Swiss-Prot record:
It comes from Methanothermobacter thermautotrophicus (strain ATCC 29096 / DSM 1053 / JCM 10044 / NBRC 100330 / Delta H). GO terms for biological process: translation. This is Large ribosomal subunit protein eL14. The keyword Ribonucleoprotein applies. It comes from the Archaea. SUPFAM superfamilies: Translation proteins SH3-like domain. Keywords: Ribonucleoprotein, Ribosomal protein. HAMAP family: Ribosomal_eL14. GO terms for molecular function: structural constituent of ribosome.
Amino acid sequence: MAAIEVGRVCVKTAGREAGENGVILDIIDKNFVEVVGVNVKNRRCNVSHLEPTENKIELKSDDIEEIKKELESLE
């Protein structure tokens, strides 16, 4: 299991959104990824501030609202 991959559900561990679940949308480089979640804004995040979970979402489209609904169904 690759820890940091597109579609992986993670928990943010730092910042104002700490403790919230998010999904990795894109890998920017070795230090940053783009994350979105129900209570997480669509923005880049340092991978050291993420704790990957065993859950993964299949990203069928780039629609943020669809991704948020799938994430809510996991919680």
